[in-house]
């Protein structure tokens, strides 16, 4: 598992790379009230993926890896507070495929 600063986990699960919010980010932003996925399926490093509005701030999450978005947590658009959950199966943001393995390995360890 990789960790970007204090805000994003990246975990390789099978052939996919799952991106989720860290507990630090959840604490920093407060209760999530609005989520909008803004990216196309094909993304490059630093592309904005999702915009999150929470009680303490608004953030735009960018991807540290290039690849193809296979799945977005669209349930979070309907029920944004699930991103405040401690459960990984609820607080994930998106899943990438076609990722350069070396680029993933170069990310900081969690």
Curated annotation (Swiss-Prot):
Q: SUPFAM superfamilies in the record, alphabetically?
A: Single hybrid motif
Q: Does the keyword Calcium apply?
A: no
Q: Which UniProt keywords apply?
A: ADP-ribosylation, Lipoyl
| GO terms, biological process | glycine decarboxylation via glycine cleavage system
Task: Tell me where in this chain the PTM N6-lipoyllysine is found.
Answer: 56
Q: What is the effect of changing residue 56 to R?
A: Loss of lipoylation
Question: What does the UniProt record tell us about how this protein is modified after translation?
Answer: Is lipoylated on K-56 by LplA2 (SAV0327) and then mono-ADP-ribosylated, probably on D-27, by SirTM (SAV0326). The mono-ADP-ribosylation state of GcvH-L might regulate the availability of the lipoyl moiety for redox reactions; ADP-ribosylation would inhibit the interaction of the oxidoreductase with GcvH-L when it is not required, thus ADP-ribosylation of GcvH-L might be acting to keep the response 'off' under non-stress conditions.
Task: Mention any one GO cellular component term assigned to this protein in its UniProt record.
Answer: cytosol
> The Lipoyl-binding domain covers which part of the protein?
10-97
Modified residue annotations for ADP-ribosyl aspartic acid: 27
Stored InterPro entries: Biotin_lipoyl, GCV_H, GCV_H/Fam206, Single_hybrid_motif
Q: Does the keyword Nucleotide-binding apply?
A: no
Please give the annotated consequence of changing residue 53 to Q.
Decrease in lipoylation
Subunit description: Lipoylated GcvH-L directly interacts with SAV0325, which reverses the SirTM-mediated mono-ADP-ribosylation of GcvH-L, and with the oxidoreductase SAV0322.
Main function:
May act as a carrier protein for the ROS scavenging lipoyl moiety and/or as a substrate for oxidoreductases such as SAV0322 and SAV0323.
| Protein name per the record | Glycine cleavage system H-like protein
**Native source organism of the sequence:** Staphylococcus aureus (strain Mu50 / ATCC 700699)
């Amino acid at each position: 598992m990789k960790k970007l600063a204090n805000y994003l986990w990246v975990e390789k699960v099978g052939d996919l790379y799952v991106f989720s919010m860290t507990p630090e980010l959840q604490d920093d932003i407060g209760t999530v009230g609005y989520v909008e996925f803004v990216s196309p399926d094909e993304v490059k490093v630093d592309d904005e993926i999702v915009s999150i509005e929470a009680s303490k701030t608004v953030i735009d999450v960018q991807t540290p890896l290039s690849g193809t978005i296979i799945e977005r947590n669209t349930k979070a658009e309907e029920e944004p507070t699930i991103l405040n959950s401690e459960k990984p199966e609820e607080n994930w943001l998106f899943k990438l495929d076609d990722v350069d393995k070396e680029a993933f390995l170069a990310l900081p360890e969690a």
